[in-house]
From Swiss-Prot:
Binding-site list for ATP: 60-65, 213, 225
Domain remark in the UniProt entry: Contains an N-terminal AAA+ ATPase domain and a C-terminal winged-helix (WH) domain.
Pfam family, one: Cdc6_C
InterPro entries attached to this UniProt entry: AAA_22 (IPR049945), Cdc6_C (IPR015163), Cdc6_ORC1-like_ATPase_lid (IPR054425), ORC1/CDC6 (IPR050311), Orc1/Cdc6_arc (IPR014277), P-loop_NTPase (IPR027417), WH-like_DNA-bd_sf (IPR036388), WH_DNA-bd_sf (IPR036390)
Function as written in the Swiss-Prot or TrEMBL entry: Involved in regulation of DNA replication. Binds DNA.
Swiss-Prot/TrEMBL GO biological process terms: DNA replication
Protein name per its UniProtKB record: ORC1-type DNA replication protein 2
Native organism taxonomy: Archaea, Thermoproteota, Thermoprotei, Desulfurococcales, Desulfurococcaceae
Similarity-based family: Belongs to the CDC6/cdc18 family.
Keywords in alphabetical order: ATP-binding, DNA replication, DNA-binding, Nucleotide-binding
SMART domains tied to this protein: Cdc6_C
Signal peptide span: none
Length: 410
């Protein structure tokens, strides 16, 4: 009979949980924190803009965790020196304009700043003034930063004013008080910055690329979560090794700590549901299998443009309709029709259309192959990646498209 359950702290398995220490990428966190602290403790204030980015198509590789951990460490180290560094976190995907971004930042500072109905520039000025009056500093994480660069509702001038606020709205005492840590999906964000705000891109101090996790790194992460969140008698090293070998990038996995942690959590929940008081290898394998089957990377899909999502949906629709492969010409025709009739957006030209297809293929969402004999002319055939459930994917894509269109994204 199961009396106490397998978990001693379920929060450890939440997606937003930040561990008390980073056993993997501790050096990267220390290097980032040192950049902010060196300037701050020398009396130069905060004005740094640094960036963390991943690899194309890789999610769950610790970018947000590293950013939040670093900012927390900066705040704690500054407090020991008698300085107050406030922290703010904004997911830019959910904040489509400068007003919303500033409103979220102000809310986290706790300053009595009136934001409703106020112009964004006035809010920013009030924030700078409050930091001066209180002699505080502010370190802001802008997650999903590439969303800000692609948003039609955030002008280049707005981005420049925000990230170079000490130039546009200097503090009354001349001390820079706002720093930024940008978190982007991959290196393409730097290219977008060069196009939209080259003056800021050239001044990014530290650009940190995070690769996907290897199996030994995933084991270390899982071990920490198990120690903090599970009862001691619940798990054995072999259970963690099994999961880390499945997801480790060096073992053919996608290197996602997020998926590895979810698999461990699922295995424990299965054991609890069966009345067991510990894990078994068969349950771990079952959890991994179910986690793989249900694996739709919502985070990854949210980073796609509306046009990429429309194309992906059409390919999934073809799969659901029993079409193993769809040729590029027919897909193009369906894309044009769907763009105009279903989504009321102008379809992109052929060059951009093929760029979208290449991107979807590079992410592993779509398979592509040249047509064989028996087809008139040479073309390319596409299908949904076999590991993705078409019906569930369509449901997720529809929700994302609806949210993007409501926010003015293309």
């Amino acid at each position: 009979m199961l009396r106490h359950g397998l978990f001693k702290d379920r929060r450890v398995f939440d997606e937003n949980y930040i561990p008390p220490e980073l056993r993997v990428r501790r050096g990267e966190a220390e290097a980032l924190a040192r950049i902010y602290l060196n300037r701050l403790l020398s009396g130069a204030g905060l004005s740094d803009v640094n960036m963390i980015y991943g690899s194309i198509g890789r999610v769950g590789i610790g970018k947000t965790t590293l950013a939040k951990f670093t900012v927390k460490r900066v705040s704690e180290a500054a407090a020991k020196e008698g300085l107050t560094v406030k922290q703010a976190y904004v997911n830019a995907f959910n904040a489509p304009n400068l007003y919303t971004i500033l409103s979220l930042i102000v809310r986290q500072t706790g300053y009595p700043i009136q934001v409703r109905g106020a112009p964004a520039l006035d809010i920013l000025k009030a924030l700078v003034d409050n930091l001066y009056v209180e002699n505080h500093y502010l370190l802001v994480i802008l997650d999903e930063f590439q969303s800000m660069l692609s948003s039609p509702r955030i002008a280049a001038e707005d981005l420049y004013t925000l990230l170079r606020v000490h130039e546009e709205i200097p503090s009354r005492d001349g001390v820079n008080r706002i720093g930024f840590l940008l978190v982007a999906s991959d290196v393409r964000a730097l290219s977008y910055m060069r196009e939209k705000i080259p003056q800021v891109e050239s001044q990014i101090g530290f650009k940190l690329h995070l690769p996907a996790y290897k199996s030994r790194e995933l084991y270390t992460i899982l071990e920490q979560r198990a120690e903090l969140g599970l009862r001691d008698t619940v798990w054995e090293p072999r259970h963690l090794e099994l999961i880390s070998d499945v997801y480790g990038e060096d073992k053919g996995g996608d290197g996602s700590a997020r998926r590895a942690i979810v698999a461990l959590k699922m295995a424990c929940e299965m054991a609890e549901a069966m009345g067991r008081d510990s894990l078994s290898e068969d349950l771990v394998r079952k959890a991994v299998s179910e986690n793989e089957a249900a694996s739709i990377q919502t985070h990854e899909l949210e980073a796609l443009s509306i046009h990429e999502l429309i194309i992906l949906r059409l390919i999934a629709e073809a799969t659901l309709g029993g079409m193993e492969w769809i040729n590029a010409g027919l897909l193009r025709q369906r894309y044009e029709d769907a763009s105009l009739t279903m989504y009321n957006v102008k379809p992109r030209g052929y060059t951009q259309y093929h760029i979208y297809l290449k991107h979807l293929t590079s992410l592993g969402l779509v398979d592509a192959k040249p047509s064989g004999r028996g087809m008139r002319g040479r073309t390319t055939l596409f299908r949904l990646a076999p590991h993705l459930p078409a019906d569930r994917l369509i449901e997720v894509v529809d929700n994302i498209i609806q949210a993007k269109m409501a926010s003015g994204y293309e």
